[in-house]
Amino acid sequence: MADTTGRIPLWLIGTVTGIIVIGLIGIFFYGSYSGLGSSL
């Protein structure tokens, strides 16, 4: 019995989490490269 109804699928959570993590890392490295993240 797959209870995916009314519940967010696990693959969707993993995909969104991966995109957010990659986005944050990209923003962090971009900020460090452009000098904005040097104060962090």
Swiss-Prot record:
The keyword Transmembrane helix applies. Pfam families: PsbJ. Gene3D superfamilies: 6.10.250.2070. The keyword Repeat does not apply. One of its GO terms (cellular component) is photosystem II reaction center. Belongs to the PsbJ family. This is Photosystem II reaction center protein J. It comes from Piper cenocladum (Ant piper).
